[in-house]
Amino acid sequence: MTHLALPRFWAHYRSLPEDVQRLADRNYALLRANSFHPSLHFKKIEGRRGLWSVRVGAHHRARATEKPEGIVWFWIGTHAEYDRLLT
């Protein structure tokens, strides 16, 4: 599975604390090696066609959309922000 990131994803990423950035980097490496590793909770967002999410530690999430070229990451932030985006 191919994973790509939009420039706006990187803008969100750079706004995160460094420890969360390091965790996101480790989780991305795991995602590339095994997309469905249980610790990632990589899954389609129910009721949101073509949207995916992945866990970045206990307090952060990332969102992506499914495109013909692969999974395109466009957002990363806190779990609270993630919940607000889904409502």
Task: Report the location of each language-model feature.
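Short, charge- and proline-biased low-complexity linear segments
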Residues: 22-31, 80, 84-85
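Arg/Lys-rich, positively charged N-terminal/basic patches that mediate binding to nucleic acids
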Residues: 1-27
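Residue-level signal for pocket-adjacent positions within structured domains
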Residues: 11, 35-40, 77-80
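Enriched for short, Lys/Arg-rich terminal
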Residues: 2-4, 56-87
